[in-house]
Amino acid sequence: MESQQLSNYPHISHGSACASVTSKEVHTNQDPLDVSASKIQEYDKASTKANSQQTTTPASSAVPENPHHASPQPASVPPPQNGPYPQQCMMTQNQANPSGWSFYGHPSMIPYTPYQMSPMYFPPGPQSQFPQYPSSVGTPLSTPSPESGNTFTDSSSADSDMTSTKKYVRPPPMLTSPNDFPNWVKTYIKFLQNSNLGGIIPTVNGKPVRQITDDELTFLYNTFQIFAPSQFLPTWVKDILSVDYTDIMKILSKSIEKMQSDTQEANDIVTLANLQYNGSTPADAFETKVTNIIDRLNNNGIHINNKVACQLIMRGLSGEYKFLRYTRHRHLNMTVAELFLDIHAIYEEQQGSRNSKPNYRRNPSDEKNDSRSYTNTTKPKVIARNPQKTNNSKSKTARAHNVSTSNNSPSTDNDSISKSTTEPIQLNNKHDLHLRPGTY
């Protein structure tokens, strides 16, 4: 009968568990079955009133009407969890649903199994709300983008918030090998750029253009772990995630540095294979350029031995340096340092010969003075400097004859030639010569 009375009070619950009632727990002389009809009516009214008002559980300090029995109470149940991780590690609804993301660019739209070490950004709600990815996920980037009829359709608010972002963004392929990570991260960066997140990608100096927001960091983390499973990540990426499993920005920054290093390596190899030297630049500068390239390649894991380096250097030599290809008797065991000793020797010899050439040349001022002291027979005006020149000058033939005979004929002839030309010439008419009238 007492159990029937307790069943009439389902709203009464004190404590954390239902306590059983036995005859040993009742310490009273009053017969528990001896209850008046008026009290039973009061009990019925109280039970009806409690059921109609749907009262909550009273405080633990409340005293039951029957002080001799422990009040039954159901055990407390913790609130349900959205996933296998504590509730304080979950994202808020605002974080999980940022506006403005295009398709494949919404964190709450991506189904995934999170890393075992990363419970922070597990999306709330049942997993059934996330649609499965279409068959294009994990395929090469040349595959056409999925059609809108088979995929999630953005709401009008999401469409209005999108600016330059495409309606459908092609997702990156799935990473399937640690060796493919350098190529995969390039497609992932392209995916972020198409998702209107180019400003958060680190630049050449390792810093992004703008600060990343919490929603963008959530999106970055979720998409990275979806398309790059942890078992296929390189060791250096796992080392970063072991320190901070949300530091995707550091992974991107290191990846960009490696891309630049790879580009520099390719440029160094091309430069080394196309060396050209003919002595137009100092030998020291040429040696510094070549040794820096070789050291940089060796530091990046591309070993260039002496034999290969010497062959590449000698192939680019020209001019006076070209004979080093054939006259060198230590081709097999020659080092880069020994080859540059020969290059320096030729360069110094060239510089010495160039510096000594002006010592053997005549000074232009000396040439002018010498031209005044020597007789030039081709220019009579320069040679004829007779101060006793008369008005009746000799012809060019007579002057030339005088000059030529002045050095060879005896002094008597010179005296006869030096006589005045104004005296008349007497002709001896032995051969009965007749002159024309008026000529004498």
Curated annotation (Swiss-Prot):
Biased composition regions of type Basic and acidic residues, renumbered to the chain: 429-440
Site (Cleavage): 401-402
GO biological process, one term: viral translational frameshifting
Biased composition (Polar residues): 1-10, 48-60, 127-152, 419-428
Annotated stretches, region: RNA-binding: 299-401
Record field: compositional bias (Low complexity): 153-165, 402-418
Post-translational modification Phosphoserine, affected residues: 416
Main location: cytoplasm
Single Gene Ontology MF annotation: RNA binding
Induction behaviour: Ty1-DR1 is a weakly expressed element. Induced under amino acid starvation conditions by GCN4.
Key words of the record: Cytoplasm, Phosphoprotein, RNA-binding, Transposable element
Region (Disordered): 1-93, 126-173, 352-440
A Gene Ontology term for the protein's cellular component: cytoplasm
Pfam families according to UniProt: TYA
Compartments, record wording: Cytoplasm
Top-level taxon in the UniProt lineage: Eukaryota
Coiled coil: none
More details: Retrotransposons are mobile genetic entities that are able to replicate via an RNA intermediate and a reverse transcription step. In contrast to retroviruses, retrotransposons are non-infectious, lack an envelope and remain intracellular. Ty1 retrotransposons belong to the copia elements (pseudoviridae).
Function: Capsid protein (CA) is the structural component of the virus-like particle (VLP), forming the shell that encapsulates the retrotransposons dimeric RNA genome. The particles are assembled from trimer-clustered units and there are holes in the capsid shells that allow for the diffusion of macromolecules. CA also has nucleocapsid-like chaperone activity, promoting primer tRNA(i)-Met annealing to the multipartite primer-binding site (PBS), dimerization of Ty1 RNA and initiation of reverse transcription.
Assembly: Homotrimer.
Protein name in the entry: Transposon Ty1-DR1 Gag polyprotein
Lineage: Eukaryota, Fungi, Dikarya, Ascomycota, Saccharomycotina
